[in-house]
Each structure stands twice: as C-alpha cells, then as structure tokens.
Amino acid sequence: MIDQYKHQQLQIGLVSPQQIKAWANKNLPNGEVVGEVTRPSTFHYKTDKPEKDGLFCERIFGPIKSGICACGNSRPSGAENEDERFCQKCGVEFVDSRIRRYQMGYIKLACPVTHVWYLKGLPSYIANLLDKPLKKLEGLVYGDFSFARPSTKKPTFLRLRGLFEEEISSCNHSISPFFSTPGFATFRNREIATGAGAIREQLADLDLRIIIENSLVEWKELEDEGYSGDEWEDRKRRIRKVFLIRRMQLAKHFIQTNVEPEWMVLCLLPVLPPELRPIVYRSGDKVVTSDINELYKRVIRRNNNLAYLLKRSELAPADLVMCQEKLVQEAVDTLLDSGSRGQPIRDGHNKVYKSLSDVIEGKEGRFRETLLGKRVDYSGRSVIVVGPSLSLHQCGLPLEIAIKLFQLFVIRDLITKRATSNVRIAKRKIWEKEPIVWEILQEVMRGHPVLLNRAPTLHRLGIQAFQPTLVEGRTISLHPLVCKGFNADFDGDQMAVHLPLSLEAQAEARLLMFSHMNLLSPAIGDPICVPTQDMLIGLYVLTIGNHRGIYANRYNSCENYPNQKVNYNNNNSKYTKDKEPHFSSSYDAMGAYRQKLISLDSPLWLRWKLDQRVIGSREVPIEVQYESLGTYHEIYAHYLIVGNRKKEIRSIYIRTTLGHISFYREIEEAIQGFSQAYSYTI
C-alpha cells in the first residue's frame, strides 16, 4: 500500500466481502470466474502438480514456472490479444511466477463466521458495539442458544424478541421439536437466528451515529449523578463510564475509516498466497509443509460437509447442521488464533499448529523478525553505558562507529578541502587514521543528528534524536535521564544508531525527535525525564549530611567573620572534630574539600548573601548569644544571623554540607543556562 506521500506501508484492518472477491477473482476468456478454493487438496501424488481448485491451484494463484501453464505450454511470441494471456486448455495465466507471492484466493463459507480477533480480543469490539456480555455472545456464536427475530403481524411460531435463554427458560424445550421437522429451515430463516449469522444481523442493524449520541447522553447522566457513597455502586458507575467512552471511540473510528460493523463477521475467508505457506519436498520423499495449509484443509473439509448438509436440509437433522456450523466456526478460529478455544490443535507428533496470529505476533513473528529486525545501511549497534558528563541532547559515539557512519561525508569534505585528490586516497587516509580525518569528522558530526533506537519500539520515545560526540572505547554513551523513555538500563542493553540522510529526515529529527523536545510522556503527559535508580542514590548520598546537633557559640562559631576567609591551609585548629568550620564562599569550601580537609557530609557554616533571606515568618531562634560589644548571634536550626548593637544584620551563615553546596551550584548553573537559552529564543 502506498500513501499520498508515496511511502510504502502496511495496514491491517477490516475489508468488505466485495473487496476480498476483487483481490482473488480472475475472469477467464470463456467467461469462467476463478478465485474460489473449493478443494482441500494440494499436489497430485503422481504428477506432483497442483490440484485444480485446490490450495495451490495454478488457475487461482498463477503458474509455478514463469510464463508456463499447467499443460507445459508457453505464450506464443508476439501475442497481444487479451484472450491469449490465458491457456485455452487449462486456464492458467501466462505471467511471472512471482505472482504467487501476492495473488490471493478465498473460501466461500457455508455459514457466517465471526472473526475471533474482534470477538474474543481485549476489549471485544463486537461486545462493545452491541453492548452485551461477551459470554452471551459466545454462547450465541457457538450455538448454545438462539436469538428470536423480531415478530411480525403474520402468524409465527414465536412472538418473542431477545435471547431465549435469558427471557424464557422453557423456550429451548418449546422449539426443540421444530429442530427435527422437515420445515426447520423455513422456521429457522423466518423465526430464529443462531450462530454468527445472528451476530451479523445485529451488527448490520446498528446506526453508529445513534450509538454515539445515546452513549454520550448516558455518560452525562452518570456524570451528573456524582458519588452516592456506596463504594460498589460508585465502582460500577466508573466502569460503565469508561465503557461508554470506549464505545463512542470505537463507533467514531468505524465512521472515520468507512468500515461497516458487520464486516467483523466473515462470509468469505481469504486464502494466503501459496509462496507465503509453502510445501517443500526433501530427499527421501519427505514433505515439509506450513501449518497454515493444514488449518486451511481443516476449514475446507468442514465447510464442504456443511454445504452438503444444507443442500439436503430436508433429510439432515437440524442438530447435525447446527453442530457442523459450530465445527466450521471452531476451524476458522483455529486458523486465525489457535489458542482462542483453550487448548491449541496439535498434529500427529504432538506439535502445536502455528496459526496466523502465531506467525505474525511475537519476537519471532513476521513483523519483528523479518521486517523490523533487518540490518540497514548507515546504522550501527553497540552496548550503552552511562555518560554523566553529557548534555541531555547528546550521545557519545565510539570512534569506530562514527567513522563508519560518516565515512562518505568525511570523504566528501576531504576532497572539497583539497586534502586528497580522489576517493581511493581519502579511504587510505581514513584507514591510516590521520589527524585531519578526526578534525573533519568532528566538523561533520557537529551539524548532523543521529537516531538511537532500543528494541522493542513500543511507543514513539523508543526512537529519539541526539547530537553525537566522539568518545573512546567501543560503547555508546547515553545520558541517564533519557533511559526511561527507552525503557533501558545499563546492565548490558544494546541500542542501534541510525543516520538520517535527507534534509527532511534531519529536520524532523531536530524539530520533533530530539531528546530535550520529549520531556513528557505522550500517553499520560507526566514527566518522563526524571531521575531514577543510580541518580536517586547518588543524590541521596550527596545530600544526606551528618546528623549532628548544632554546635555553635561565641567561643567557636564565627572567629573568622565578617570578611575574614578561612585559612584551610592551616591544619592545626580550624577543623577539629568538635568545631564546624565557617567559609566565606562556596569556592573556599570546595578548596577545602580538594585538600581533603573536609568531607562531603561534614557540617559547615557558609556565609550567605544578605539579599537572599532564609528566615521563616514564624521561625524563632533556638538561642540568642550576646557579646560584650553588643554583637549578637541568633542561632536557628539551619542558619546563623550575626548582628550589631543597632540591630543591623552584618552577615548570615547557613548550616549545610559540601554535598548540598555542590547540588545547589549544579541546579543554579542549569537554571541560568536555561534562562540564557530562553532569552536567545525570544
């Protein structure tokens, strides 16, 4: 499928029976229409040729050998007549054999069958639209009870509507005699409905716009009721409101995509192209076949048996017909999802058959293993490690990966700057790792973002853009704050790096995919770049401090204030066990730490700016100390105020640790950097 932007894409959804026929049907020159698979056979046991109207029929799916029909003939050279595209004898079209990779067929089901994905999936789309319990619908689909059609003015056997089992307990006994009568078919077509046909009738009668209007009215009524005080009733009301919202969204989606609800019940079952479910002959007459073929055979056999019974409905008991319809439903369920009916179907070697769902889903499914897990050009892969010195929008690329990814750009710049004369010499310079190569590589990387992806990509934050920087080693460095979006940690996780080439891809990476542009979760809106694990432990250790009581008085508290700096080069008396040092600035405290005079959690007094008040409106000092000259010291829980006799504050000291100082400085620098960047944008 190709969209309006000429992008190839794959879409899974519901299609009409007419579309299924259009995919498969071909008109032969003699007026015959082929496309329906009616026989469960595959290849003839003597000729090893596909059986006509079977699962590998050449008339339906195309020739096995390009341009050669089943008879062994080829199209005459120079033939341009439309009728000469087909063999007059066998009806096989003279086309390339690759058509067997995409040409589909179909099975015309003798009775409607519900699609198991839409009936038993969570949530059940059929149950949501019909607003009925899933168990009741399953009982109706598998023939446990019947549904009475709307009664008319004409005389009828029953004048009921709804589910027999629910409304009248004796209905099963009252209609059971009709099951064995010759006129059961007439009675059933006019009076009752059972199986998937009953579901199809109810879905066809739905008006999606009325469903949206009625659901909205009911939701508003529940919203206006408020809380009743009964926990159980409030819980049921919340569940009902969520269900109504889900039902309105589902109906709106059906309207927007022009999909009819009754398409969830199948009348025609598509048959995959034969090349996607091959049969392989090995030495020793051993045959290896896809499990899908065996499941298709099972469906065709049961469907043919049901068609035979319906043709002879006057002789066949009604119970037998209903039982055969149930078998057809179960066979289609097994084909689509083998585990939907409890225990999966097994072959003679006790091996579980792989259904279509098993082929598609999971890590080894068609999408993740075949389509998404392939190597592509301009990409690399390596283990991720933490890069604490990186900015949020940066990642560290190893030299080996970077030179491989940007090799063509480096060669172009080497030739442009006349450092080399041709590509061969440029590659030699790169191989010899000359200094000019690294200079040009850094210039190229400075203006070119890269994409990092961690599988599985479950949401859009699984792929983010970063500004690459060169690092030593063979691992990719990553800022720890972006790990939550990737659901990654540093215990051996691997990430793939991709290089956007076109200008459109680079612009999209810069405007939409950069990590600093994705700070909130797209699902719930909460911050997703938050500290976790090692960062929280590091912040805790950095700011835990030493839980020691206040030890400050006029004999040891402020011997070096107001402007005298601490002489931390003197190791004699300033930093004893009983004295908490005073520092005029954070730089003095950092200098003392570098000289190992204090530790990260050592309590200290740091002189604070007078314009940054730290006094609470209701906080009172623990103790007030006065000196002979009128100077006083107000000691609080975490700070100290020094004033003169005129009640003027001369200095303020806060009681903190070096860890708190370091954390404060980092936060302050980050805020200042953000403010500068914001002012530049304005």
Swiss-Prot record:
Gene3D superfamilies xrefs: 1.10.40.90, 2.40.40.20, RNA polymerase II, clamp domain (4.10.860.120), RNA polymerase Rpb1, domain 3 (1.10.274.100)
Residues engaged in binding Zn(2+): 69, 71, 87, 90
Reactions accelerated catalytically: RNA(n) + a ribonucleoside 5'-triphosphate = RNA(n+1) + diphosphate
UniProt KW keywords: Chloroplast, DNA-directed RNA polymerase, Magnesium, Metal-binding, Nucleotidyltransferase, Plastid, Transcription, Transferase, Zinc
InterPro entries for this protein: DNA-dir_RpoC_beta_prime, RNA_pol_asu, RNA_pol_N, RNA_pol_Rpb1_1, RNA_pol_Rpb1_3_sf, RNA_pol_Rpb1_clamp_domain, RNApol_RpoC1
Predominant place of localization: plastid
EC top class named in words: transferase
Annotated residues for binding of Mg(2+): 489, 491, 493
A GO-annotated cellular component: mitochondrion
Cross-referenced Pfam families: RNA_pol_Rpb1_1, RNA_pol_Rpb1_2
EC number(s) from the headed UniProt entry: 2.7.7.6
Coiled coil residues, start to end: none
Gene Ontology biological-process annotations: DNA-templated transcription
Subcellular location: Plastid, Chloroplast
Disulphide-bonded residues: none
Cofactor section: Mg(2+); Zn(2+)
GO molecular function, one term: zinc ion binding
Family listed: Belongs to the RNA polymerase beta' chain family. RpoC1 subfamily.
Complexes and interactors: In plastids the minimal PEP RNA polymerase catalytic core is composed of four subunits: alpha, beta, beta', and beta''. When a (nuclear-encoded) sigma factor is associated with the core the holoenzyme is formed, which can initiate transcription.
Function: DNA-dependent RNA polymerase catalyzes the transcription of DNA into RNA using the four ribonucleoside triphosphates as substrates.
Listed name of the protein: DNA-directed RNA polymerase subunit beta'
Gene name of the encoded protein: rpoC1
